[in-house]
């Protein structure tokens, strides 16, 4: 390991590659300061899947990407969409900075109210429940939250088990009810795998909705968003819940997720926003 000063002494010309993710303001500010003096690039490696957002990928999927772009509900969403593509292709931070906006703005789109039946898919330790409570001023009809990783679920119960009208489920979400092997040693990035070590009970959105017609769904399920959405087609078609869907885990999320939401219910208005994060994580679809 060498310091920046040592690198400057050893090399007259160099490029800095950032190979970690952060949303810590001080760290992001340091990266921005480095960019003023040096060429700084962020290699785009998807959280899930093996695709790379390169020229051949754009050629293969160009038509579907343009179709998704045309589904965006406002000009800001289209700008975010374009800048996300530019960033994924080039790794240049200027595109990332150009697409940033606050969570407050995104939740103005959702316009949550005191009668929401909230479904939190990927609840972790309860931070997104806190976010929901913030934007509903602690007034809601019900909360249903799923977290499959046993140790994390225990912390979720400790943090949120006393909330009124709240159901916490130690389950994963999938396109149908079954049992799947689950990689449970990755913390927040836990994934469903074919060669995992832990059996997890899975349920679909439509199965959960037999008891509660959810009005708002937040989904951050580490790369299986497309599969999970396909298990909620009936609820989306018949009741059109508000959606807050992570769309950055796989390269194909940028076009497949808007397409499946539109197919479920063409009346959805689909917005895209990116919140401060390096690399292009915390990029979500907000659908109403």
Q: Can you annotate each of these PLM segments?
A:
Residues 1-288:
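Phosphate/nucleotide-binding beta-alpha loop and adjacent structural elements of enzyme active sites
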